[in-house]
Amino acid sequence: MKTPAERIRLLLLMSIAMPVAWATWSALLNNFVVEKAAFTGAEIGILQSLREVPGFLAFTAVFVLFVLREQTFAIVSLAVLGLGVALTGLFPTEYGLYFTAVLMSIGFHYFETMKQSLSLQWLHRDEAPQLLGRMIAAGALTSLLVYATLWLLFEWMSIDYVWVYLLAGGVCLGMAVYMRLSFPVFSSDSTQTMELFLRRRYWLYYALTFFSGARRQIFVVFAGFMMVEKFGYSVSQIALLYLINHVFNYLFAERIGALIGRIGERRALIIEYVGLIVVFTGYAFVNEATLAAVLYVIDHLFFALALSLIHI
């Protein structure tokens, strides 16, 4: 049995719209807050902590579903994400950035929760792996195009942050409006259970997920901010670094998956965490910009390894 084409098209559009806004926001953030709001490590830490609050509260999505259908909720969340990104450049102050980051994060985390749920419900089991791979590829290609565009805009045109945030957020918001107006509300082939489940036997998975989240914040928050504040990386250089990361991920992701299949999850985890000890120790003592960039790329490869382990 085949998945209806309209459902696939909607999921693909969602997979494209989200990284237009998210990739722009994340790539520009560190340079923007340092140049326009004079952020230090303390302020960026507060901003990123506030940004994670909606992620922690993503379980509250089950309560919203008593009021909104999942498809509608996903599109509304995508629109909120786009709005938060569009407003970011207009509020270059400490509290303004806190507000827009939280607004963006609310849309992002609710959207990701709903999109994953819709994908599992709409895609037929025999087609799901291929179609999920297609959606991941669409999102990755969109991110690559965004980073390449950012590099061109800031390297050759010196465009202002405000217009880039407005453009990226506006595109995401516009795509959300298009999805709402152009697609019917699809029915689900499965019944959605409005409950949360925790199982004691999964405690190790919960613990590893917790530590993985903490490690991810070091990569997302500290490492990128260090590249800007300590080594003076420009927006175009950061965009280029993100571009390199995604190219490396594209080239090595399949090999990483094959490696895990050969050596097993246990050894893969040992390799990941030993490697991270070396990388984070390097972050503490590195004083050369190129070496810091190399550590950043290696860090991203270990992050790809962690993602592969999570999805096994």
Predicted feature residues:
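Short amphipathic helix-loop junctions that connect adjacent transmembrane helices
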Residues: 27-43, 221-238
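Helix-to-loop junctions at the C-terminal end of transmembrane segments
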Residues: 58-70, 154, 252-265
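Structural signature of the two symmetry-related core transmembrane helices
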Residues: 73-86, 267-282
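Helix-loop junctions at membrane interfaces in 12-TM secondary transporters
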Residues: 89-100, 284-296
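Cytoplasmic helix-loop-helix junction between adjacent transmembrane helices
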Residues: 106-137
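Glycine-rich segments within core transmembrane alpha-helices of 12-TM secondary carriers
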Residues: 132-148
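C-terminal membrane-cytosol helix-exit motif in multi-pass small-molecule transporters
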Residues: 150, 169-188
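Conserved small/polar residues in nucleotide/adenosyl-binding loops
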Residues: 310-312
